[in-house]
Amino acid sequence: MNAEDHTPELSARERILLTAHDLFYSGGVRATGIDKVIAEARVTKVTFYRHFPSKNDLIRAYLDYRHERWMNWFKDALNRHGATNGQRLNALVPTMAEWFNNPIYRGCAFINTVSELGGVLPDVLEISSRHKQDMTNVIAELLPETPNRLAIANAAAIAVDGAIVKAQLDNNAKLAALQGLSMLLSALNMQQ
């Protein structure tokens, strides 16, 4: 993905951020140099550094943008897959299948970035923790209000994260991840 793929009406900052998003997600944060982002966003170094004084600033903006984008998709996908009907927790399986089968799927941007930079950039841990908590909160909203609602939501979120990591391995792993997630969610449904 490069800046040509983004509409010319976008500001330089938006082109930089969208280009970084695509490059960081597809190739990793550490492996993607600022010069590549600058070239593909078709901006000058001066323009880049005016908007993002350091790569760390760009990483934070990338994670914030990814969080907003992914959460909007997640809520929408859950609704499309039946989260508003009876077995609401079961909507997680087709939602994850939709994501896993996307040709650009490369796992969770937050898990990936924490594994790359969590020990050296504390903001990555903070943003990623917020993302995972927000995901858990959305899952909790699928559940009836019972005393163990939060415990079930936390367990479901952990199962989702495990499926996300497993699905990165290959196509066979995607199927196994979805089957395992389905089994775990069925067990959690019995706890309600």
Segments (PLM) and residue ranges:
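N-terminal intrinsically disordered/low-complexity leader segments
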Residues: 1-11, 192
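Helix-turn-helix
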Residues: 2, 15, 19, 23-57, ...
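Alpha-helical DNA-contacting segments of helix-turn-helix folds
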Residues: 59-66, 73
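Hydrophobic alpha-helical connector segments
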Residues: 61, 75-102, 153-156
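Amphipathic alpha-helical packing segments from all-alpha helical-bundle domains
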Residues: 68-71, 87-90, 120-144
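Secondary-structure edge/capping motif, primarily at the C-terminal ends of alpha-helices
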Residues: 81, 117, 167-171
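Amphipathic alpha-helical segments used for helix-helix packing
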Residues: 101-123
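Hydrophobic/aromatic-rich alpha-helical bundle segments in the mid-to-C-terminal region
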Residues: 124-130, 145-192
